[in-house]
Amino acid sequence: MFCIIRAQLLLLLHLLVLALLLVGTVCNAHPQHGHPSELEPLALKRGGSPRDDGNTLAPRCRCIPGEACWPSTQIWDSFNRTIGGSLIKTAPLAESCYPGPKKNTRKCAVVSRKWTDQDFQTDSPVGRTYPYNITCAPVNYFAGQRPTTCSLGQLPVYAIDARTRQSVAQGLRFAKDNNLRVTVVSTGHDLLGRADGYGSLEIWLRHHRNEIRFERQYMATDGCRESGWTGSAIDIDGAYQWRDVHIKARANNVIVVGGGSVSPGAIGGWPSGGGHGPASRNYGLGADQILEAEVMLADGSVVLANHCQHTDLFRALRGGGPGFGVVLKTKIKAYPNVASVSVHHLTITPIRQTPNNSDLLDAVAVLMQAYPKLSDDGYAGYAFWLRNCKSFFIGSAKSGYRHGIWMIGKTTEEAEHSFAPVREALDKFKSKLTISESYMTYNDYWSFYTSESGLYESVGTTSVLTSRLIDRPAVEDYNRVREAVEVIGGKPEDYATNVMMLVSNGQVFADAADKSSGLNPAWRVSPYVVISSRGIPMVVDQASRKEVADDITYVKGAALQKLAPNTGGYMNEGDRNDPNYIKNFFGTIYPTHLATKKKYDPWGLFYCPTCVGAELFEETSRGELCRR
């Protein structure tokens, strides 16, 4: 079933979800901590020694349920009255499937049926479009499934339906007063579980929506003229998804750089971590689109970050990932629509299926060498391939390669001319592989997007993955490329999925001159990204999960790093367990971001795994978040 879903998603050129079957970007995946003066008594109460971090005294660990410092039911009830009854005591989505007072087979059947629906997941504060770890799986009793165990796991125990800025600030204040871990979630679309936290209070932004407004000519909120941008802009005031922003863009006949999937949040984690999509090669990554942002800091104050004020925070938001504050509002660039988008579709399947399918992998290596030149010519898009799949992948084949790549603003003739040398290079495989291709041209960007990408994908499954930015030197030698392809293709029983994302080059390279960019510099020299992933069953023991995770980190991830040793990975679709995540996700800019983190969040309130400053904390076996 995994392969069928993946084939459908990436066949339709789904961006990140497509290939990975993973998660939901948290606009802002970050927990919070507290003011030193407020937290010192809690540190002493817990018996831990207060830490002195500059001007900050704070307890070493956050409170968790069951401890003496955990708020009583009366305190939670009082807080709920303070915020107008918007506090939610969370419970697992599938708890109705398990023995106990909440068991309800009718509700369980509904949950099982809707589990893969993205709105079903997003409409719950503990819903995750691509959960990092499922600890209460739905049970299909009609299919003969039987319940195992059910718990919240790393999901929050309380959530605030934060529809106003005041309620966001009240939530942060309560968390600081009580030394609680906080997570911030808008869509729950995050691939690394950065929106999760054991025993946390969640600031749920799903309904924090005010307005999406089009500006024919961008005007900075404070009159700042340093951006140099004189084109159009879209003002996104609230935790909207890309599908909402796309409606406004299409109505005004402009292009915005959004996700290939429509479900991620348009502000916060997706752009701050990089943010790629069908238009990013031509117009820049999501991080490059941000013209300004309004951010709530840990003390509840709201600041404007742009080219004129809070410029260090502005830079961090444009590539440094989540964890600096709660992003409430952004303005992004918008571009004139185009008259044509030409798409090339290619499928390759073995004529004779074998366990290793070596001929297919030979062809994949040829294509990997061809991508930089195709990207130079203007091609962008997504490809994916599998050595083996448990079920049918392309037609009746259980292995194969498929891509949809396109040229924005160019004709079919130009697209054919560019791909012709690659097709010729593939001809040597025609006795062993079935190779099919076709072209399609659309008369504007949005006709292309709605047909080739941006569809409503199935969700709710878990994978682990690793990613690598691929520069030109990495693919100069065929034998080195083929060696890497062999490893990431995995053993026949791995059923690994590999995705090639031609989302860089073009304007992404040109934006290297932007001094306000906070992206890993490796983006500016790498035409494409490779992602290697493996699926994990909904119900699995930890030993089996660890075996898959270790394979991704120490086998497939290591092979990609060997292939491209001087680049890095894409933080929004990377390996949470990567021991070198600081170097791989941030590169040489990390010290700058860490200084910004310490300036705006000296208490580490907005902690999230693999985010800036995460190395200063650890999660204990009891689930506590503690300073090292």
From Swiss-Prot:
Pathway: Secondary metabolite biosynthesis. It comes from the Eukaryota. Its EC number is 1.-.-.-. Glycans are attached at N80, N133, N356. Residues 152-337 form the FAD-binding PCMH-type domain. Residues 1-29 form the signal peptide. It is an enzyme of class 1 (oxidoreductase). GO terms for molecular function: FAD binding; oxidoreductase activity. Hypothemycin is an antifungal agent that exhibits excellent activity against Peronophythora litchii, which could be helpful for the storage of harvest litchi fruit. Hypothemycin is a strong inhibitor of a subset of MAP kinases such as human ERK2. It can therefore be used as an anti-cancer drug thanks to its inhibitory activity of Ras-mediated cellular signals. It can also inhibit Trypanosoma brucei kinase TbCLK1 which is a good candidate as a therapeutic target for African trypanosomiasis. Finally, hypothemycin also has inhibitor activity of T cell activation. The keyword Membrane does not apply. Keywords: Glycoprotein, Oxidoreductase, Signal. The keyword ATP-binding does not apply. Residues 34-53 are annotated as: Disordered. FAD-linked oxidoreductase; part of the gene cluster that mediates the biosynthesis of hypothemycin, a resorcylic acid lactone (RAL) that irreversibly inhibits a subset of protein kinases with a conserved cysteine in the ATP binding site such as human ERK2. The first step is performed by both PKSs hmp3 and hmp8 and leads to the production of 7',8'-dehydrozearalenol (DHZ). The highly reducing PKS hpm8 synthesizes the reduced hexaketide (7S,11S,2E,8E)-7,11-dihydroxy-dodeca-2,8-dienoate, which is transferred downstream to the non-reducing PKS hpm3. Belongs to the oxygen-dependent FAD-linked oxidoreductase family. This is FAD-linked oxidoreductase hmp9. It comes from Hypomyces subiculosus (Nectria subiculosa). The gene is hpm9.
